[in-house]
Amino acid sequence: MKKRLVSAAVTVALFIGLIAGVTFKASDQKEIKHFTAFFSVEGDNIDPDNDIKKLIASQIGAECEETWLVGQDKDDAINSLIATGEYPDFVLGETALYEADALIPIDEYWDDYPNIKEYLSDEQWEKLRQPDGHIYWIPPFGISHGDDVEMLHNGEAFWIQTRVLKWAGYPKITTIEQYFDLIESYVQANPTMPDETENIPFTMLCDDWRYFCLENVPQFLDGFPNDGSCMVDTETKKVMDYNVTDTAKRYFGKLNEEFHKGIMDPGAFNATYDQYLDKLSTGAVLGMVDQWWQFYYAIDPVFKKQNLAQLGCDYVPLPVTIDDGIHNRWHTNRMAEIDYSSGVSITTSCKDIEGAMKFISDLLESDIIRERFWGEEGKDYSVDENGLFYLTNEQAEKKSDSSYQTAHMCSYSYFPRVEGMLDDGINAFSMEFQQDEFFRNQPVDIQECFDAYGVENYVELLGKNDAPGSWYPMYSYSDSIPTTSECGKVKNNLEAVKKRWLPQVIMADDFGAAWDQYMEEYNACNPHIYFDYLQQKINEN
């Protein structure tokens, strides 16, 4: 903890040195406003003289210096900021910062900025109103005006390497039993990689707040989408606790069985996030349950450098449920998964609120979105005779060059963007969502796998699902519960019990006895207080 606090203090000290209101003269003598931002997630820094950042600044008259979490806990960093009372211009707003009076009410300023006011529907904005009646943050992801396009499954799934599927003849895998049977068979026949590195059959991420892929799997196995905190019966509108279902007991019993067979990675429960990524980066992990964004962007450059696609080490998701006949809902349409519990906020330390609002508004212009996610025409992408964007081989190579990306591309990734199609109605807002370019730029083993299953992208491997109801996703409500409230304390206690007990349950020699002890301690936390609150939120929709 001491190390975390020191690291957080360093971050805060950096912010104090960056506090905004500063301007400078660009080479053409046009005044460029300079803003600062801290996003309480891990992210990639770009070069100070980044090409696209400078290009956008020359067009809109402003730029923003972004900083990210580095080796510290999110809550520690936010609490350290609150303790100083000084903030960068922009932060990833959430309940704790709202309660600390650190944020300005965006809805008091947005009448002059239709790009912001019309970014969401009135109904969607209402979900963001805080107890005082105002709106303090803007969700950056999942907002699409017009047609939506989806290629990636950015969420949670049981992932498996393409080499395992290819070895087995690309079988149909739909249950948790089939998933582990396949991994067991493969590792028995192929205990090592070609370089004699021992294969790791199955692992998972259990570090700190990222442990959700350990605890929330039962909801998916029962065919429910990622409400994140509960399951909701769409007919009765009743909240259900996925932690105590028969499926939960069966699933963790299965992990216990796989642990004792040597299939489940014994080091998973003590590994840090970085150690987990290091393990995946070897190419030796055959399968895991995780959310795409937690692993892909970290391991993809390593896989490319080591040419691991040639060995079939890339991952694809499988539509796994607890039993055959259950419709899987691992993938819900991206537009339905807006997280209302956090988003971009302007802080009370910002000395140019109107300028900050204009900066956000300008970033939502279609031409600027094109530059954020496609780059410069002729340099980063080309245009055919029909106006369709595509990448030449040279441009595709640049996209895979991390040094080039750091020096050249600037997506302002945690600022709001309009997804779906650009204003031209032809091109997707980002290359990752342009079907032809998406497939062409996939590793060779992914292309072979898609062809074998008759699909063109990751989403088609799972299938699409609409939002189950107006309440979805419920984690927008659970993540907004004040930690000091009775409900917040119960939620924290339940999480602590799960973090402590689930690894013990999986490793126990007597699973039944360990499960009973776990359930006894879980129920002692009065979970009904938490789930009654969630039911109340359902009833209000």
Label each residue range with its predicted role:
Residues E31-F35, I60-C64, T84-D89, D101-I104, ...:
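Loop/turn elements at helix/coil->beta-strand transitions in domains of secreted/extracellular proteins
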Residues S40, R370-R500, D509:
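Conserved small-residue motifs centered on glycine
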Residues K2-Q178, N216, D222-M231, K238-N243, ...:
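Conserved N-terminal structural module of periplasmic/extracytoplasmic solute-binding proteins
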Residues V41-P48, I56, S144, E150-W159, ...:
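Extracytoplasmic/periplasmic substrate-binding proteins
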Residues L69, L92-G93, F269, V289-W292:
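Short beta-strand and adjacent tight-turn residues that come in two discontinuous sequence segments
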Residues D101-R129, I183-V187, T197-V232, K237, ...:
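Carboxylate/His-rich catalytic cores and anion/metal-binding grooves
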Residues H134, P139-F212, D233-M288, V344-N386, ...:
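Helix-loop-helix "hinge/cap" segment bordering the ligand-binding cleft or interdomain interface
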Residues A284-M288, Y296-Q405:
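Structured mid-domain segments that build the active-site/substrate or prosthetic-cofactor binding neighborhood
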